[in-house]
Curated annotation (Swiss-Prot):
GO molecular function: electron transporter, transferring electrons within cytochrome b6/f complex of photosystem II activity
SS bonds (residue pairs): none
Protein name: Cytochrome b6-f complex subunit 8
Taxonomic path: Eukaryota, Viridiplantae, Streptophyta, Embryophyta, Anthocerotophyta
Membrane protein topology class: Single-pass membrane protein
Entry function: Component of the cytochrome b6-f complex, which mediates electron transfer between photosystem II (PSII) and photosystem I (PSI), cyclic electron flow around PSI, and state transitions.
Transmembrane regions listed in the UniProt entry: 3-23
Pfam families listed in its UniProt record: PetN
InterPro entries linked: Cytochr_b6-f_cplx_su8_sf, Cytochrome_b6-f_cplx_su8
GO cellular component: chloroplast thylakoid membrane; cytochrome b6f complex
Keywords assigned by UniProt, alphabetized: Chloroplast, Electron transport, Membrane, Photosynthesis, Plastid, Thylakoid, Transmembrane, Transmembrane helix, Transport
One BP term from GO: cytochrome complex assembly
Location of the protein in the cell: Plastid, Chloroplast thylakoid membrane
Gene that produces this protein: petN
Organism: Anthoceros angustus
Family of this protein: Belongs to the PetN family.
Length: 29
């Protein structure tokens, strides 16, 4: 595994986990 790939994967996971509740909240409202 490359450090860059790991960093990108971590960034995607964090952004997804932080944006999902917002998207769900907006669609729910």
């Amino acid at each position: 595994m490359d450090i860059v790939n790991i960093a990108w994967a971590a960034l995607m996971v964090v952004s997804t986990s932080s944006l999902s509740p917002v998207a769900w909240g907006r669609s729910g409202l």
